[in-house]
């Protein structure tokens, strides 16, 4: 998808997820402090549950990865929407 850091902005992502009846999303990526943080937060603000496998995200430094994980689960209001896990723990 061609978009900024929030993949809901300027795309049909929200429409597609609604059409599919998705209530939970799994967010992964190589920019923990960019698209992962903003897209995960945007999904939570839209009432979705968000799963973030910590071994499915990366950043320039380990500190950034750890901060983003901490921030997601500790942010006021939407923090409870997030579940941190690992890729091998995700099942469908």
Question: PLM ranges: what are they?
Answer:
Residues 1-92:
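Active-site-adjacent betaalpha module
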């Amino acid at each position: 998808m061609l978009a900024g850091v929030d993949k809901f902005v300027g795309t049909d992502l929200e429409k597609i997820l609604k059409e599919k009846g998705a209530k939970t999303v799994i967010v992964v990526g190589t920019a923990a402090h960019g698209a992962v943080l903003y897209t995960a937060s945007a999904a939570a603000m839209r009432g979705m549950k968000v799963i973030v496998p910590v071994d499915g995200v990366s950043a320039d430094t380990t500190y950034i990865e750890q901060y983003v994980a901490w921030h997601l689960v500790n942010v006021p209001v939407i923090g409870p929407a997030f579940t941190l896990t690992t890729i091998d723990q995700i099942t469908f």
